[in-house]
Amino acid sequence: MEPLLASSPVTSDANSRNGAGDLCSSKEGSERLKLSGDLESSETSSGDLSSEYVLLQLRIFRINLAVTALAVLVSILFVDLNAAISLLLGAFSGIIYLRLLAKNIGSLGKSSSSVGKAQLIVPAALVLVVAKVPELHLLPSLVGFLLYKPSLIIQFLLEPYAQKKSG
Amino acid sequence: MDSITTAASVVAAGLAVGLGAIGPGIGQGSAAQGAVEGIARQPEAEGKIRGTLLLSFAFMESLTIYGLVVALVLLFANPFAG
């Protein structure tokens, strides 16, 4: 029974280092331990929750980059360079828009009670820029902007695999 | 661009944004309400709720963006201008 023998001295050592071994002897001490354990577990779980949301954003960002690269490559090959540049500009705007939206949703219930509308400036600015610059096309830039939608769908489809991998 | 086309474009742009924002606005409000209630009831599911909310908000808000884009195109890159 080597694993059992190896594990028990380590825990007792850790307890004695924290002074928890002495606390366990009294009733008060065990209550304190319970409280500190609860606090630790709640801190850990809140940390996990926020990191889960951050990881989700990171996954969406990576998928968005991959979809953008694929779409730009296809448009360079089959359309023209100006369309590809418009698509890239639109995709970049889409990433910024989604980042702002995620930031607003992240602060919902914490620092604000409603989701802000600041992210809507991004598509408006995109359309204005594309309308002013004659080399850029409107339709490819809008398609590029909406590339975040397939990214979200792909992320949603791949989520069970990601959970299996992490869990 | 003649004056009738200009006036019609401005009115259409206003209607596109205004009418296009009604539905998503109501939907986003109820979705946010449900999400905040869900987080309050089950704080351990906060990450998943926020993720689902991000997904649903992104899809709902695109309806507003369609209206916004139509309005901006009518105002700044009008295809019906002479």
From Swiss-Prot, chain B:
Listed HAMAP family: ATP_synth_c_bact
Gene Ontology annotations for the cellular component aspect, listed alphabetically: plasma membrane-derived thylakoid membrane; proton-transporting ATP synthase complex; proton-transporting two-sector ATPase complex, proton-transporting domain
Cited InterPro entries: ATP_synth_csu_bac/chlpt, ATP_synth_F0_csu, ATP_synth_F0_csu_DDCD_BS, ATP_synth_F0_csu_sf, ATPase_proteolipid_c-like_dom, F/V-ATP_Csub_sf
Annotated membrane topology: Multi-pass membrane protein
PROSITE patterns xref list: ATPASE_C
Top-level taxon: Bacteria
Localization (cell): Cellular thylakoid membrane
Family, per entry: Belongs to the ATPase C chain family.
Subunit structure: F-type ATPases have 2 components, F(1) - the catalytic core - and F(0) - the membrane proton channel. F(1) has five subunits: alpha(3), beta(3), gamma(1), delta(1), epsilon(1). F(0) has four main subunits: a(1), b(1), b'(1) and c(10-14). The alpha and beta chains form an alternating ring which encloses part of the gamma chain. F(1) is attached to F(0) by a central stalk formed by the gamma and epsilon chains, while a peripheral stalk is formed by the delta, b and b' chains.
Residues annotated as site: Reversibly protonated during proton transport: 61
Keyword terms: ATP synthesis, CF(0), Hydrogen ion transport, Ion transport, Lipid-binding, Membrane, Thylakoid, Transmembrane, Transmembrane helix, Transport
GO molecular function: lipid binding; proton-transporting ATP synthase activity, rotational mechanism
Residues annotated as transmembrane: 7-27, 57-77
Function: F(1)F(0) ATP synthase produces ATP from ADP in the presence of a proton or sodium gradient. F-type ATPases consist of two structural domains, F(1) containing the extramembraneous catalytic core and F(0) containing the membrane proton channel, linked together by a central stalk and a peripheral stalk. During catalysis, ATP synthesis in the catalytic domain of F(1) is coupled via a rotary mechanism of the central stalk subunits to proton translocation. Key component of the F(0) channel; it plays a direct role in translocation across the membrane. A homomeric c-ring of between 10-14 subunits forms the central stalk rotor element with the F(1) delta and epsilon subunits.
Protein name: ATP synthase subunit c
